[in-house]
Protein backbone atom coordinates (compact mmCIF):
# COMPACT_ATOMS: atom_id res chain seq x y z
CA UNK A 1 0.00 0.00 0.00
CA UNK A 2 1.42 3.38 -0.93
CA UNK A 3 1.72 6.18 1.58
CA UNK A 4 -0.24 9.31 0.65
CA UNK A 5 0.60 12.89 1.66
CA UNK A 6 -2.13 13.10 4.31
CA UNK A 7 -1.00 9.90 6.03
CA UNK A 8 2.63 10.98 5.80
CA UNK A 9 1.72 14.28 7.49
CA UNK A 10 0.34 12.35 10.48
CA UNK A 11 3.34 9.99 10.58
CA UNK A 12 5.78 12.92 10.37
CA UNK A 13 4.01 14.66 13.24
CA UNK A 14 4.25 11.57 15.43
CA UNK A 15 7.91 11.05 14.53
CA UNK A 16 8.69 14.68 15.34
CA UNK A 17 7.03 14.39 18.76
CA UNK A 18 8.92 11.17 19.50
CA UNK A 19 12.36 11.80 18.00
CA UNK A 20 13.08 15.54 18.22
CA UNK A 21 16.45 16.11 19.95
CA UNK A 22 17.31 12.39 19.68
CA UNK A 23 20.93 11.47 18.98
CA UNK A 24 21.90 9.08 16.19
CA UNK A 25 23.63 6.08 17.69
CA UNK A 26 23.89 3.53 14.86
CA UNK A 27 23.11 3.35 11.15
CA UNK A 28 22.62 0.19 9.10
CA UNK A 29 21.59 -0.60 5.53
CA UNK A 30 19.99 -4.06 5.76
CA UNK A 31 18.88 -4.03 2.10
CA UNK A 32 19.86 -1.91 -0.87
CA UNK A 33 16.69 0.19 -0.54
CA UNK A 34 16.42 0.52 3.25
CA UNK A 35 18.28 2.34 6.01
CA UNK A 36 17.78 1.63 9.70
CA UNK A 37 18.83 4.21 12.30
CA UNK A 38 19.03 3.78 16.04
CA UNK A 39 18.23 7.05 17.80
CA UNK A 40 18.44 7.72 21.53
CA UNK A 41 16.27 10.20 23.36
CA UNK A 42 16.78 11.02 27.04
CA UNK A 43 14.53 8.14 28.05
CA UNK A 44 14.30 5.65 25.16
CA UNK A 45 16.02 4.10 22.17
CA UNK A 46 14.09 4.04 18.89
CA UNK A 47 14.71 2.28 15.57
CA UNK A 48 13.77 4.38 12.56
CA UNK A 49 13.25 2.59 9.24
CA UNK A 50 13.64 4.62 6.05
CA UNK A 51 12.56 2.58 3.05
CA UNK A 52 12.95 3.67 -0.57
CA UNK A 53 11.52 0.42 -1.97
CA UNK A 54 9.40 1.20 -4.99
CA UNK A 55 6.43 -0.89 -3.85
CA UNK A 56 6.56 -0.11 -0.14
CA UNK A 57 8.37 3.19 0.43
CA UNK A 58 7.83 4.32 4.00
CA UNK A 59 9.26 5.97 7.09
CA UNK A 60 8.34 4.45 10.45
CA UNK A 61 9.53 3.31 13.84
CA UNK A 62 10.05 -0.43 14.06
CA UNK A 63 10.85 -3.14 16.55
CA UNK A 64 11.58 -5.61 13.75
CA UNK A 65 15.03 -7.19 13.61
CA UNK A 66 17.01 -7.00 10.39
CA UNK A 67 20.01 -8.98 9.24
CA UNK A 68 22.74 -6.60 8.17
CA UNK A 69 25.44 -7.36 5.59
CA UNK A 70 28.90 -8.14 6.97
CA UNK A 71 30.35 -5.22 5.02
CA UNK A 72 28.26 -2.04 5.11
CA UNK A 73 27.37 -0.61 1.68
CA UNK A 74 28.90 2.69 0.60
CA UNK A 75 25.83 4.82 1.28
CA UNK A 76 25.60 3.40 4.81
CA UNK A 77 29.26 4.29 5.45
CA UNK A 78 28.63 7.79 4.13
CA UNK A 79 25.62 8.25 6.43
CA UNK A 80 27.67 6.99 9.38
CA UNK A 81 30.43 9.48 8.60
CA UNK A 82 28.10 12.47 8.30
CA UNK A 83 25.30 11.67 10.76
CA UNK A 84 26.47 9.42 13.62
CA UNK A 85 26.42 11.39 16.85
CA UNK A 86 24.23 14.08 15.32
CA UNK A 87 21.05 15.36 16.96
CA UNK A 88 17.70 15.62 15.21
CA UNK A 89 16.94 19.34 15.41
CA UNK A 90 14.00 19.48 13.00
CA UNK A 91 11.68 17.16 11.16
CA UNK A 92 9.63 18.79 8.43
CA UNK A 93 7.83 17.79 5.30
CA UNK A 94 7.08 19.24 1.92
CA UNK A 95 3.45 20.47 2.21
CA UNK A 96 1.07 18.37 0.15
CA UNK A 97 3.83 16.02 -0.98
CA UNK A 98 5.53 12.80 0.13
CA UNK A 99 8.90 14.19 1.18
CA UNK A 100 10.16 14.32 4.76
CA UNK A 101 13.30 16.21 5.79
CA UNK A 102 15.30 15.15 8.84
CA UNK A 103 17.67 17.97 9.89
CA UNK A 104 20.58 16.85 12.06
CA UNK A 105 23.08 19.05 13.92
CA UNK A 106 26.40 17.28 13.44
CA UNK A 107 30.11 17.83 13.91
CA UNK A 108 32.17 17.62 10.72
CA UNK A 109 35.72 16.28 10.43
CA UNK A 110 37.09 19.77 11.27
CA UNK A 111 35.07 19.88 14.50
CA UNK A 112 32.63 22.51 13.21
CA UNK A 113 28.89 22.25 13.78
CA UNK A 114 26.97 21.73 10.55
CA UNK A 115 23.40 20.91 9.63
CA UNK A 116 22.98 17.82 7.47
CA UNK A 117 19.57 17.10 6.01
CA UNK A 118 18.39 13.65 5.04
CA UNK A 119 15.60 14.06 2.48
CA UNK A 120 13.34 11.02 2.40
CA UNK A 121 11.41 11.06 -0.88
CA UNK A 122 8.56 8.54 -0.86
CA UNK A 123 7.52 8.65 -4.51
CA UNK A 124 6.86 5.07 -5.62
CA UNK A 125 9.53 3.94 -8.06
CA UNK A 126 11.26 7.33 -7.69
CA UNK A 127 11.65 6.91 -3.92
CA UNK A 128 15.07 7.91 -2.65
CA UNK A 129 17.14 9.05 0.32
CA UNK A 130 19.30 12.11 -0.32
CA UNK A 131 21.89 13.53 2.10
CA UNK A 132 22.23 17.30 1.73
CA UNK A 133 24.47 19.91 3.35
CA UNK A 134 24.16 23.61 2.64
CA UNK A 135 21.80 23.00 -0.27
CA UNK A 136 24.26 20.67 -2.03
CA UNK A 137 23.91 16.92 -2.41
CA UNK A 138 26.50 14.91 -0.50
CA UNK A 139 25.11 11.70 -2.01
CA UNK A 140 21.92 9.76 -2.72
CA UNK A 141 20.93 6.17 -2.09
CA UNK A 142 19.96 5.95 -5.76
CA UNK A 143 22.04 8.26 -7.91
CA UNK A 144 20.26 9.77 -10.90
CA UNK A 145 22.37 11.08 -13.77
CA UNK A 146 21.40 12.82 -17.01
CA UNK A 147 20.97 9.46 -18.78
CA UNK A 148 18.34 8.50 -16.18
CA UNK A 149 16.50 11.83 -16.09
CA UNK A 150 16.72 15.02 -18.09
CA UNK A 151 14.56 16.78 -15.50
CA UNK A 152 16.42 16.16 -12.23
CA UNK A 153 19.81 14.70 -11.41
CA UNK A 154 20.88 13.47 -7.97
CA UNK A 155 24.66 13.43 -7.91
CA UNK A 156 27.23 14.54 -5.33
CA UNK A 157 27.98 18.26 -5.53
CA UNK A 158 24.83 19.27 -7.39
CA UNK A 159 22.29 21.63 -5.85
CA UNK A 160 19.40 19.76 -4.24
CA UNK A 161 15.98 20.52 -5.65
CA UNK A 162 12.96 18.78 -4.26
CA UNK A 163 10.95 16.51 -6.49
CA UNK A 164 7.50 18.02 -6.61
CA UNK A 165 4.74 15.82 -7.91
CA UNK A 166 2.45 17.75 -10.19
CA UNK A 167 -0.63 16.52 -11.94
CA UNK A 168 -1.40 17.65 -15.48
CA UNK A 169 -5.03 16.69 -15.07
CA UNK A 170 -7.36 19.61 -15.75
Question: Which stretches of residues belong to each language-model region?
Answer:
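Acidic, proline/glycine-enriched N-terminal capping motif
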Residues: 1-164
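Conserved small/polar residues in nucleotide/adenosyl-binding loops
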Residues: 165-170
Amino acid sequence: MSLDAATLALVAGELKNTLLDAKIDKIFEPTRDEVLMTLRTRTETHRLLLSARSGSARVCLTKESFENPLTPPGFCMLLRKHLTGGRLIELRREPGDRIVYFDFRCTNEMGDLVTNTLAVELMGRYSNLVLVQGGRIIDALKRVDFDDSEVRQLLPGLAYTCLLYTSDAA
